[in-house]
C-alpha cells in the first residue's frame, strides 16, 4: 500500500528529524533535506493519481484515503510544500469537510498545530520534550 511503503515512512522521518531530533540538539541537515524532498516527491505522485478522481481509488472514499490522509495532511508539520499540487489540495478539502474527519481530529485531544494552525514551534518543543533521552 502506498501509505505504508512510501508516504507514512518518509513523512514520519521528515517530521522526526525536524521536530524531535533537531530540538533535542541532534540536527542532521542531510537527513532533513532527504526526507523532505522524498516526501514532496511522493505527494506529487499522489497529486498525479488524484487527477480526475475524487479519492485515491476512484470516486468512492476508501481505506486508502483513510490511511494516507493523516500522513499527507501533516505536510505542514513536516515542512513539505504542497504549493501547486492542486489535486492533492482539493482532496484535502474533500476529506477535511467530512464530519467524521473533524471528529477524529479531536482524538485523543485537539491537534490543530499538526495542520498548520496555532504555534507550530511551541507544539514541536512540547512534542520533542517527550522523546528526550
Q: Where do the language-model regions lie?
A:
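GST-like fold's C-terminal all-alpha helical module
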Residues: 3-100, 132
Amino acid at each position: 500500500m502506498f501509505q505504508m511503503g512510501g508516504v507514512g515512512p518518509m513523512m514520519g522521518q521528515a517530521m522526526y528529524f525536524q521536530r524531535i531530533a533537531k530540538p533535542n540538539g541532534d540536527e542532521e541537515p542531510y537527513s532533513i533535506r532527504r526526507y523532505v524532498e522524498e516526501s514532496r516527491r511522493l505527494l506529487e505522485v499522489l497529486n498525479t493519481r488524484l487527477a480526475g478522481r475524487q479519492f485515491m481509488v476512484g470516486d468512492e472514499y476508501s481505506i486508502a484515503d483513510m490511511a494516507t490522509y493523516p500522513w499527507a495532511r501533516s505536510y505542514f508539520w513536516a515542512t513539505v510544500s504542497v504549493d501547486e499540487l492542486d489535486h492533492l489540495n482539493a482532496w484535502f478539502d474533500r476529506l477535511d469537510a467530512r464530519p467524521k474527519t473533524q471528529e477524529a481530529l479531536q482524538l485523543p485531544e485537539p491537534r490543530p498545530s499538526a495542520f498548520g494552525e496555532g504555534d507550530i514551534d511551541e507544539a514541536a518543543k512540547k512534542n520533542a520534550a517527550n522523546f528526550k533521552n
